[in-house]
Design a protein with these regions (language model features):
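C-terminal extracytoplasmic interaction modules
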Residues: 13-368
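Structured beta-strand-rich cores of soluble
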Residues: 1-19
Length: 368
């Protein structure tokens, strides 16, 4: 090993750097180098000309992300010492810098995994920008699915982050920092994150620990659904609001109605109008029907006159769920239908990211 003060000279994409060709410690500049350089990267394989390369890389987004990295001091210091699959390597390392490596509109880029201000700081006070709202009106029928994380994937933990310590003209050392949520009794397992290959700052390591702990605490599920491409203006990393309605089964809301309208239910039922789904037990017809009944003194009015006879019923209770999600992937299938995959992105009532608020709350974590 040798100690090098600076690395290779690359194009600097931060707006303040004016595309200077010089050493850099920003992950975005490394990405651009690996994707475009024809000797040290895959530029020769990716495209034949520089003009073609520019069409495959979103430099504007890289420039915006560079502001986020520098503002939060998420610096990239390390070496790629062995052959790597560039796309896999970048996807694996992006979370070290609180980012996601994305492919949007056929162009490669990297985007912060958190909402950011125009200046690049983590936005923990302003509402996230909702690009589109999805309801039963634009979600194709029977396509919406929720996938909850396994129980072991939702257990809280304390993060021990290993990072590299550099001293001029000396061999590198190693240090660790542990981050734990201040909530609870502290009796949680430890998960270790080794970022010694790229991280040389304790503050950077602490931010990684806070991010990983908060993700485990806040995110519980992902969703997938299908929609039509018409009017769709989305890309990976965008935020969407999904509003769904459901009528979950409840045993205490299920009962019987006699032919004369007398209601038998596990709990008392107040007078008023109720929407029910029922199966008539007096006929061989197994189809369910939905009707509204007027209940007075525990009797469904006009039930006996309807000729429906005795029935089993369940009160229909419609629950509305409204959540913010972060788009992970969009796929256009052969039927010209767009399939969207997104992960839960918890926000408060003002649409402010709870993950961002947690990370910026100094009193929420114990660091040692």
């Amino acid at each position: 090993r040798v100690w090098l003060k600076e690395g290779i000279k690359v194009t600097n994409l931060h707006p303040d750097d004016g595309s200077a060709i010089q050493a850099s410690n920003l992950f975005t500049d490394l990405i651009y180098y690996l994707l475009t350089d024809k000797r040290g990267g895959i530029g020769e394989t990716l495209a034949r000309t520089d003009a073609d390369l520019d069409k495959l890389i979103d430099k504007d987004q890289l420039s915006e992300t560079a502001k986020f990295l520098r503002k939060n001091k998420l610096f990239c210091n390390g070496a790629i010492s062995q052959p790597e699959n560039v796309r896999s390597w970048l996807s694996e390392k992006a979370p070290v810098f609180l980012c996601d490596f994305i492919l949007s509109d056929g162009r490669f880029s990297v985007k912060p995994a958190l909402p950011v201000t125009d200046g690049g700081d983590i936005n923990h006070t302003g509402a996230v920008t909702i690009k589109q709202i999805f309801t039963s009106g634009n979600i194709l029928e029977d396509s919406f699915k929720l996938d909850y994380l396994e129980a072991e994937e939702r257990n809280l933990f304390k993060a021990t982050v290993r990072y590299r310590v550099e001293r001029e003209n000396q061999l590198p050392g190693e240090a660790t920092v542990t981050v734990r949520s201040g909530e609870g009794d502290g009796e949680v397992p430890t998960e270790t994150f080794d970022v010694t290959d790229l991280c040389t700052s304790r503050d950077h390591a602490v931010l990684i620990g806070k991010y990983m702990v908060t993700l485990r605490k806040r995110i519980t599920h992902t969703c997938t659904f299908s929609t039509t491409p018409y009017g769709l203006d989305l890309a990976p990393g965008d935020y969407i609001r999904v509003i769904t309605e459901s009528s979950p089964y409840s045993a205490v809301r299920t009962g019987t109605i006699a032919a004369d309208g007398t209601i038998t239910l596990a709990t008392s039922i107040e007078d008023g109008d109720y929407k029910i789904i029922y199966y008539a037990t007096s006929t061989d017809d197994a189809d369910a029907e939905v009707v509204t009944i007027d209940v007075s003194n525990g009797i469904a009015q006009d039930w006996s006159d309807s000729g429906r006879g005795a029935a089993i019923f369940s009160l229909v209770e419609t629950l509305t769920s409204e959540n913010v999600y972060r788009v992970e992937q969009l796929t256009l299938n052969q039927e010209n239908i767009v399939e969207i995959s997104a992960s839960e992105f918890p926000c408060d009532n003002g649409s402010v990211s709870l993950i961002a608020k947690d990370i910026k709350d100094r009193d929420l974590f114990d660091v040692f």
